[in-house]
């Protein structure tokens, strides 16, 4: 890949989706390799200051070690959306990821989700993430503060991950963050003249 990337001026880069510890990220992110790696440390952390601070420090150190820019990811299709995760009870970072997966696996019934608190923390997290140096990767719907849909019945799941574990029901999959975006068509569009950029109400 690097040979192809270097044919461009400036050289192109790709982003590795490698769920590895921060001390191994430079192996994928260096300018001699792909150029960047998704930093999933935020996706594994609860809304605890010291845990978030550690994720930032490790992300910056990893970027410096690789000679690449830092990357920041709050959510993706492999973890419940952070607007929901941050509304669950707080636990140490080592078990937060598992708590969120258990909550999803049991249709959102094992722990009470505080949607209002989760939404506030999600907004604060995105603002923090956007203030950090490097590249921010925003998963579809994050910009709207969408929560995870945890109560999709097993017989309606479409993710292959769920199909592969439906008998044991050990992995619900990624459908809860892939539901259609919410839409209300009751209000008419706000353009008087769609060809005039100043024709808004």
Regions found by a protein language model. Give the residues of each.
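Active-site and adjacent substrate-binding regions of carbohydrate-active enzymes
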Residues: 1-201
């Amino acid at each position: 890949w690097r040979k192809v990337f270097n044919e461009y001026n400036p050289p192109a880069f790709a982003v590795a989706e490698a769920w590895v510890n921060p001390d191994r990220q430079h192996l994928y992110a260096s300018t001699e390799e792909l150029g960047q790696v998704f930093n999933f440390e935020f996706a594994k952390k609860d809304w605890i200051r010291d845990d978030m601070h550690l994720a930032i420090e490790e992300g910056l150190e990893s970027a410096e070690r690789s000679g690449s820019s830092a990357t920041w990811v709050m959510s993706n299709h492999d973890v419940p959306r952070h607007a929901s995760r941050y509304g669950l009870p707080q636990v140490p970072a080592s078990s937060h990821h598992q708590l969120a997966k258990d909550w999803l696996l049991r249709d959102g019934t094992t722990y009470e989700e505080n949607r209002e608190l989760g939404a506030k923390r999600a907004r604060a997290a995105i603002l923090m993430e956007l203030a950090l140096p490097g590249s921010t990767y925003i998963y579809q719907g994050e910009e709207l503060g969408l929560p995870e849909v945890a109560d999709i019945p097993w017989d309606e799941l479409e993710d292959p991950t769920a199909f592969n574990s439906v008998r044991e029901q050990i992995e619900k999959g990624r459908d809860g963050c892939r539901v259609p975006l919410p839409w209300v068509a009751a209000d008419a569009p706000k353009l008087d003249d769609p060809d005039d950029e100043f024709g808004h109400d």
